[in-house]
């Protein structure tokens, strides 16, 4: 047998026991937060870097890497990604650790009730100079209710699927990825 206790305080009310979603009108603010930092080299010499968002992206097949990668690239060529972080807003110097990362915060109210996709674009330079390693960390959504109650959701609860566009390059940092390089990540973010 299982016994579930509903204390009656915000977030633990019996009347909401079967609720799966919250009506957007019941959310006062919703902010997407994350941080970016670079290690090594000179990040200002990086060819291209952006963070994009879209509520029009059709989604990934997740079993056909070629089709998925072409879809992501075509979406960029067609200009359908909305830029969250333009190249000019990225950190311009490498730092020693995540505590010195540049924080970013974006209002998500316009995306309530919609499926979204986020793309991180990083195109490095040739190997004649040290390549900066980019860290995209601490991604979360913070919701505030009219009562002042706050709820934080980490990236692990978003249901995102990573797509590793450089999986066939056999990069040094991917050697530990013995399976699913197409849809895997180097770290467990």
List where the protein language model places each region:
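Short beta-strands within extracellular/lumenal beta-sheet-rich domains
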Residues: 3-31, 99-107, 135-136, 188-189
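A short acidic (Asp/Glu
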Residues: 16-17, 46-49, 129-133
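Polar/charged alpha-helical tracts
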Residues: 25-26, 73, 77-78, 109-110
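Extracellular beta-strand-rich recognition modules
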Residues: 29-43, 47-53, 114-124
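Non-cytosolic beta-sandwich-type ligand-binding/adhesion modules
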Residues: 44-90
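Terminal, low-complexity interaction segments
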Residues: 89-158, 163, 177-189
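Eukaryotic intrinsically disordered, low-complexity regulatory regions
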Residues: 171-174
């Amino acid at each position: 047998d299982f016994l579930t206790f509903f204390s009656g305080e915000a977030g633990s009310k019996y009347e909401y026991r079967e609720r799966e979603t919250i009506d957007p009108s019941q959310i006062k603010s919703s902010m997407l937060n994350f941080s970016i930092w670079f290690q090594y080299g000179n990040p200002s010499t990086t060819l291209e870097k952006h963070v994009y968002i879209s509520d029009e992206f059709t989604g990934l097949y997740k079993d056909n890497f070629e089709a998925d990668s072409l879809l992501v690239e075509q979406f960029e060529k067609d200009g359908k990604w909305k830029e969250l972080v333009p190249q000019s807003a990225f950190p311009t110097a490498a730092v020693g650790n995540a505590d010195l990362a540049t924080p970013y915060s974006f209002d998500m109210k316009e995306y309530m009730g919609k499926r979204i996709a986020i793309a991180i674009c990083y195109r490095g330079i040739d190997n004649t100079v040290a390549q900066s390693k980019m860290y995209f960390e601490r991604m979360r959504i913070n919701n505030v209710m009219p009562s002042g109650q706050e709820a934080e959701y980490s990236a692990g609860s978003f249901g995102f699927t990573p797509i590793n566009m450089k999986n066939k390059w056999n990069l040094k940092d991917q050697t530990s990825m013995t399976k699913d390089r197409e849809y895997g990540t180097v770290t467990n973010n």
